[in-house]
């Protein structure tokens, strides 16, 4: 890595380590990509064509919405304020409906987006969350839910702290991704 003029960091080594186990490429610094193909690791400069042309989908009501090859079903439920023991997989697909600002939109990630996940005291880069949860060829179809204030959910990682369900919640937006 140093031979290519790049600084060695935990993140870049982790990205390259993942590549060696798979096939693909990762941006390690400012337009320089680590590329792994047929068991050979190399470095290249250029643009990574990771962003998909999947169109944005506005969620206007309950129902099933198509996003690329995925179906997302949205339902709104009343909530009595009692927090029960809920399986983590289901809880990550539930948001406090009244804390959502404006319309929900399903779309691809955009450069520089951040999210503060539930029970975390720091912001996470959406790109890094998607890279960690999805193989290179599946990243462009990762479901990202946004409202007028930013990202509220990242598939494979969870919901934003600002829309988490708490004792003040009146309505829940629940969704499943198929």
Predicted regions and their residues:
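AMP-forming adenylation/ATP pyrophosphatase catalytic core
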Residues: 1-178
């Amino acid at each position: 890595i140093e031979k290519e003029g790049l600084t060695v960091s935990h993140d870049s080594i982790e990205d390259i380590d993942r590549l060696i186990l798979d096939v693909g490429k990762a941006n390690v610094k400012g337009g320089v990509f680590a590329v792994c193909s047929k068991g050979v690791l190399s470095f290249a400069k250029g643009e990574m064509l990771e962003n998909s042309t999947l169109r944005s989908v506005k969620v206007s009501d309950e129902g099933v919405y198509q996003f690329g090859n995925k179906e997302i079903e949205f339902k709104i439920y009343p909530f009595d304020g009692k927090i029960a023991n809920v399986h983590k997989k289901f809880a990550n697909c539930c948001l406090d409906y009244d804390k959502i600002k404006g319309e929900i939109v399903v779309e691809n990630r955009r450069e520089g987006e951040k999210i503060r996940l539930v029970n975390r005291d720091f912001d996470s880069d959406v790109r890094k969350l998607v890279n960690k949860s999805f193989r290179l060829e599946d990243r462009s179809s990762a479901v990202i839910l946004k409202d007028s204030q930013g990202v509220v959910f990242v598939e494979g990682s969870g919901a934003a702290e600002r829309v988490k369900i708490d004792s003040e919640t009146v309505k829940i937006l629940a969704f499943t991704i198929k």
